[in-house]
Amino acid sequence: MAVKRLIETFVPENYKIFLDIDRKTKKIKGQVAITGEAKDTVVSFHTKGLHFNKVRAFSVDTNFIENEEDEEIVVKIGETGRVTVSFEYEAELTDNMMGIYPSYYEVNGEKKMLIGTQFESHFARQAFPSIDEPEAKATFDLSVKFDEEEGDIIVSNMPELLNINGIHVFERTVKMSSYLLAFVFGELQYKKGKTKSGVEVGAFATKAHSQAALDFPLDIAIRSIEFYEDYYQTPYPLPHSWHIALPDFSAGAMENWGCITYREVCMLVDPENATIQSKQYVATVIAHELAHQWFGDLVTMQWWDDLWLNESFANNMEYVCMDALEPSWNVWESFSISEANMALNRDATDGVQSVHVEVTHPDEIGTLFDPAIVYAKGSRLMVMLRKWLGDEDFAAGLALYFKRHQYGNTVGDNLWDALAEVSGKDVAAFMHSWVNQPGYPVVTAEVVDDTLILSQKQFFVGEGVDKGRLWNVPLNTNWTGLPDLLSSEKVEIPGFAALKTKNNGKALFLNDANMAHYIIDYKGALLTDLLSEVESLENVTKFQILQDRKLLAKAGVISYADVVNILPSFTNEESYLVNTGLSQLISELELFVDEDSETEKAFQSLVGKLFAKNYARLGWDKVAGESAGDESLRGIVLSKTLYSENADAKTKASQIFAAHKENLASIPADIRPIVLNNEIKTTNSAELVKTYRETYIKTSLQEFKRELEGAVALIKDEKVIAELLESFKNADIVKPQDIAFSWFYLLRNDFSQDAAWAWEKANWAFLEEKLGGDMSYDKFVIYPGNTFKTADKLAEYKAFFEPKLENQGLKRSIEMAIKQITARVALIDSQKAAVDKAITDIAEKL
């Protein structure tokens, strides 16, 4: 079924929306008048789950047909031209965090409810009839009445104009897409401030949280708006910017224009006990959503195939913004650790979607929001483009883009045109190969007969069909005398020895600062030279060596045994970035290590030796004035040291737990998950799991909740695991938004994996009903694909999911997961013996 475009028959100009919402009955009564241009005598509007009592056109009752399968109502208006079509209807609050839905929480044991909205991507139709397409921009006059109680407030995209007999009337919005309309009502507390330009900024949350938890997000929001106004040279166009933390939320956050909504863990920060990682995460999420107020809201993609125009740029700009506001955080290191790593891994599987991808079925719209591609890869491409253009031209091009297309819709070439006009470079020619093609290249660098040969070829992990794709690869080398771009399959540069002398004999490396989306396979002396200088290289280059060698091993280009052999080169590293690279590599090597084997003992010894110096340097206690990098690194070092069975570390972890056992939340946040995990591993106590679960239910600290989720999943007790799995059906214990994470923690552990997998299969109907429209739904397809590593599990996965391939919302994820598991099984079979030997040998030598 092709995607039907309703804007082709009706172009909306204005919506007048009145909603009467009753929380107790969960009923909605709606009246909507849509004024616009009818291009046909029969027009259609999107609708889902709405029950219509009356439809009028030209002030006369008219016939209509409700087409549930196509999610539309067909209205016979009899004439073309400007018309107002009005609807009276009834609906119910949804129960899957889409449309208009309830959020549940408790304050001092009393259960309460907030009402919020989530209309992206195409869920406005569950709240009111509409042309629910991004191109169909219009203004909105919103009025809401609800069962208001003392202490309740309501907020929306625009300021409240007046309150007439309990009807809250909001100012008319600017011209915008339907998916950006939003409102929230209930008992909320808030703090407010103003930007230098006079924009009112507010942070809102339920009273389940300390009001002080609003201070950090409010400060970040104010400073981010000020940064973007300056960087984009385009004023923030609305009178206010509200930021609301919702107890139940499908995604991380949503960029509703002027009324941004968040999952609580993505916005609120415990002022007394928060990690630097938590602050950085919250700050980048807020900066991401505020970047959208220009990229996505002011200028919106014409159709969902250009979703990357929203998400790729917002993902890039969150780092640009935070690097400017908090330079000591070194957020570009975090970018390499998370975004680059995620993109390189996902994008190496044949069949992955491109950044720009055609939408041929309505159910495919939700699949576009692939965090590894549209967000991570797309932002990596924008980082590459910004470096290629230079920051000044990049920013000036964006300013021109906003000026030219504000309140309108665009396609990718509109952005390339603006950047090209400012920079004088052919941006479209440079970017098309990256945005329109899936995958990325491996650049092979080798010297043959004094000739440096650089060649590119699409990189695959697992089986892949080479279609001869080529990219415009920015070499970004540390040497002079080499070309800027590799656009052909191969380039040969003679006189390598002389060229090396000209560059003072230093080792050659490509992709400086890890800013372009490719990896490098250095052959022979080129790799030897690079490793010989490893201590003097920039931290990001060291990280790249680990990143690229790991991926080459994963693809079978080299052996993981080869990668194990370079580990001794990194024993003296104090950098958070480099040690994270080591940690990621260790996680990959764990695939080959059988539990309770001699190889595991050798591997534990090796890991302990790799992190011994940093354990001695950092210890357990935060030091006043220490860097953000050291604070972040401590958790990695302690985790790996405990994995190595270090007696001192295990004793210290148990002592810290004992000192805080009456108030587990008071454990210093930077070491808290380490301590919680260790106690479960050490005691394997069902009673301790019970304590953790009771604490989980009572606490309002979302980061702490996530830590407790991870810790209880480490239990090795079949009865307790069964109880944990069954609790996922009880929303009073585990909220639907958290089921996927909680379940994954059990799936990834060998002891509980079979039980978690069996639970998913037995409860698929429950997951479909509860999470079918939710952004976490396909995680139950993706997570097993990221985890399973045996032929038996591959067969079971196929048997369960292949019959579901007709579900267009899951199809690509299922196909990708099968390829990933197949590749992982083959990799372990082919390399395990060599890797086990290398681990044993290096552990003895180190």
Curated annotation (Swiss-Prot):
Cofactor binding note from Swiss-Prot or TrEMBL: Binds 1 zinc ion per subunit.
GO cellular component terms given for this protein: cytoplasm; extracellular space; membrane
* Top enzyme category: hydrolase
Q: Cofactors per UniProt?
A: Zn(2+)
Binding-site list for Zn(2+): 288, 292, 311
Residue sites binding substrate per the record? 120, 252-256
Metal-binding in keyword set: yes
User: Mostly located where?
Assistant: cytoplasm
In the UniProt entry, which residues are flagged as the active site? 289 (proton acceptor)
Gene Ontology molecular function: alanyl aminopeptidase activity; metalloaminopeptidase activity; peptide binding; zinc ion binding
Q: Where in the cell is it found?
A: Cytoplasm
Q: Name one GO biological process term.
A: proteolysis
The alphabetized UniProt keywords are: Aminopeptidase, Cytoplasm, Hydrolase, Metal-binding, Metalloprotease, Protease, Zinc
What EC number(s) has UniProt assigned to this enzyme?
3.4.11.2
| Tagged with keyword Hydrolase | yes
Homology family? Belongs to the peptidase M1 family.
UniProt subunit comment: Monomer.
Question: Which function does this protein serve?
Answer: Aminopeptidase with broad substrate specificity to several peptides. It has more affinity for oligopeptides than for dipeptides. It plays an essential role in the metabolism, it may be involved in nitrogen supply or protein turnover.
Entries under PANTHER family matching the protein = PROTEASE M1 ZINC METALLOPROTEASE (PTHR11533), PUROMYCIN-SENSITIVE AMINOPEPTIDASE-RELATED (PTHR11533:SF174)
Q: What is this protein called?
A: Aminopeptidase N
Gene it is expressed from? pepN
